[in-house]
Amino acid sequence: MSRPIVLHICLAFCSLLLLNFAAQCLAFPNLERREIVLLHAEKGQSERLNTDDLENDSVTSNTPVSGDPMIVLAGPSTMSLNKVFPSNKETSPVGAGLMQADGSNIYTATEPEVPAGEEVFGSSQPERMSPESRPSKATLTNPVMPTASLNIDEREEPSRGTIIQPTVEGTTEATQGFLSYVDDQLFATESPEGLSLGHSPLSLVNTKEMLTTSPRTEKFEANPEHKTTSFPGSKLTAGTEPSQMTADNTQATAATKHWLPTSESILSVEPETDSLLGAPEVTTSVSTAVAAAPVISDEWDDTKLESVSQIKTPKLGDNTETQVRMEISQTTQAPDIGMEVMEEGKALTEAADVSLKLPEMETHMETTLPMAHGGERASDQSSVTPTSPMGDTKVSVMNLVQDTADFVESTKENGAMFLETTVSISEYESEVHQPLGNRFKDIITQEMTTAVQAAEATVSLVTQEQQVATLEVTRGEDETKGGRELPSATVDAPRATQLSRRWEPLATVVSTTPIPVSFKVTPAVEDVMDTVTGPNEELFTPILGSPVTPPGITEEAPSTSPALADPEASSERRTAAPSFSYVNTAASYGLDQLESEEGEDDEDEEDEEEEDEEEEDEEEDEEDKDADSLDEALGDTELPGFTLPGITSQEPGLEQENVVSLEGVTFQVPDAIQWEQQNQGLVRSWMEKLKDKAGYMSGMLVPVGVGIAGALFILGALYSIKVMNRRRRNGFKRHKRKQREFNSMQDRVMLLADSSEDEF
């Protein structure tokens, strides 16, 4: 028995390695491009990153993948990817070593990542430089080992192994701002969706969302509210801390949550980030736990995520600027995105380094994630490393490896490459991000959502409304970022404009390497459809607009390594929103307002007709709550064309900003056309259902009647035959009896005659 088992294990491992290498190969070209930009933009930082890499290498934590060391992710450019740490499961205290190395660069963020063993890599560095605080540490650790819980120095609680989340540390305040913005937008923080979403294993960490954006602080304040929502799924304290969302606490919380990676090598990224962190700017480290949606610290007050990174960076001033509301509801990953976006251009952070490490962590996460989530896939491992949103925002989008660690190596490689290539966002915003300035709105068509069937796909971007809003923002910006274009990115000009206005410095570029998952971007940005991928296909929808990236929209792309190398805004969102009831409705109707609405209605009519009505009220209530929170958080944003209607299925893309601007109004009524289409779809589905039911009944009446009649006839015939036989039998018996009696009389007569003769 042992021999076949060993053979199967070996085969599975080899296949995973091959998949990872393939994914890495796909990601390489983009990474190199990014690296070039980074080299020009951040030579000084690159040196720092290199030193960090060296430190990280020395202290490398084990990669979650099997024993053989992961491929070195070091990019040719500024950051050598921290070499992939050996895959040993044991988590060496490398974290501490890394931390210290980083600490020399900047206050070390004690980023205890308790990899596989729950051992926290304690960094001897000052606690206050908690991983999140390090700007450079935009690390997205996604080790998924359920066993290990990683505790960031200030973590309220060690992240639970089950909730292995990619931890993303936005290095700069801008990143954090973005994170909060995303949080608000993607998750109306209060909306339960965000919570459930965070929980879903499938959710991808949208590194894109993490893209460090150095947007204005407009969204900053809104973030805390959104942050307040705790994710039910997240085991991490993310849920509790997010509510506080004080800059330090929220940030720290995010970090704590995010450092779920149980796997050994989560931490490796951090050291590099620290060195990058030359600038005091704080990186928010938001790692999203699949189960637990990490909290994205919305409030970047002058203390960046203190809890997470406990870093009080002098540059916090910008933090408000950048804080983006991230909608956590969509994905636990939202926090990650927020983090990356955080940097507004403050200081170059070691985002690149973080990114490098991130990939490794990510891979780790990947493997463990399934365990953590139980049935759920580890896809939520996608780690975003918003690298220093400022100086060197290097964002690597790690997309989760959907199954196990397939993606682990490739993801790591991608992350590392991206980090190297990405240029600091704040400093080089114009260089890198202007091209990227256009926000991509990856609207995954509802058709995508229809594919949601699989447990992984189960993460429907529940936070459709909020997602939509975020995606819409990206739309305004150019549809194509400098070299990349999202396969399914559609730009909504008006919303994009708003977003760009908000996040001008942050041009988030999300590029996804071609992913098996095909997600369709609907032209109407407003309907950011929840993208739900098919059971296995992971939808990786990086969204360039930092505010725009709704975690819900992107799902994991199992084999795609996100090419989001945009230093600034690449963020990978993983969305898992199995808990959301209206995920299905959203998926079925999608947020494609006009184009995909009817088609989607037709597709999902049968399944979700009845659900839509039931869920409408619930969703409306949730939306109202979301809108209120958004109003509070995003006072400056202007109303979108329309906010999502009460019905999730028909939710138009609703930017969080837009929602906020609706201050008195929960949501704007959708256009008459949209209502009409929606109603038509509902009526059509109802009619079809009635016809189907009636036809079934009418068709069954005849055969059933004939069958019953035939059965009765047969029973009657049998009974009649039985009765006839009984009569015949009785008559025969009677006849025999008479005969017998006759015979007996004859006998008696004979006997009498004989006796009489004798007597004579």
Curated annotation (Swiss-Prot):
Q: Where in the cell is it found?
A: Membrane
**Is Calcium one of the keywords?**
no
Query: Do the record's keywords include Disulfide bond?
Result: no
Keywords from UniProt, A to Z, are: Glycoprotein, Membrane, Phosphoprotein, Signal, Transmembrane, Transmembrane helix
Residue span of region Disordered: 49-69, 117-143, 216-243, 373-392, 474-495, 536-652
Phosphoserine PTM positions: S755, S756
Gene Ontology cellular-component terms listed: membrane
Residues modified by glycosylation: N56
Positions on the Cytoplasmic side per record topology: 722-760
What Pfam families does the record point to?
ARMH4
Question: TM spans, by residue?
Answer: 701-721
Topology relative to the membrane: Single-pass type I membrane protein
Topological region Extracellular: 28-700
Q: Where is the signal peptide?
A: 1-27
Which residue ranges have biased composition labelled Acidic residues?
594-635
Quick one: a GO biological-process term for this protein?
regulation of TORC2 signaling
Please describe what this protein does: May modulate immune response and may play a role in inflammation. May negatively regulates AKT signaling by modulating the activity of mTORC2 complex through RICTOR interaction.
> Quaternary arrangement and interactors, per the entry?
Interacts with IL6ST; this interaction prevents IL6ST protein homodimerization and bridges ARMH4 with IL6R and STAT3 and therefore inhibits phosphorylation of STAT3 at 'Tyr-705'. Interacts (via cytoplasmic tail) with RICTOR; this interaction bridges ARMH4 to the mTORC2 complex and inhibits the mTORC2 kinase activity.
Which PANTHER family does this UniProt record tie to the protein? ARMADILLO-LIKE HELICAL DOMAIN-CONTAINING PROTEIN 4, FULL-LENGTH CDNA CLONE CS0DC025YL05 OF NEUROBLASTOMA
**What protein name applies here?**
Armadillo-like helical domain-containing protein 4
Q: Mind giving the lineage of the organism this protein is from?
A: Eukaryota, Metazoa, Chordata, Craniata, Vertebrata
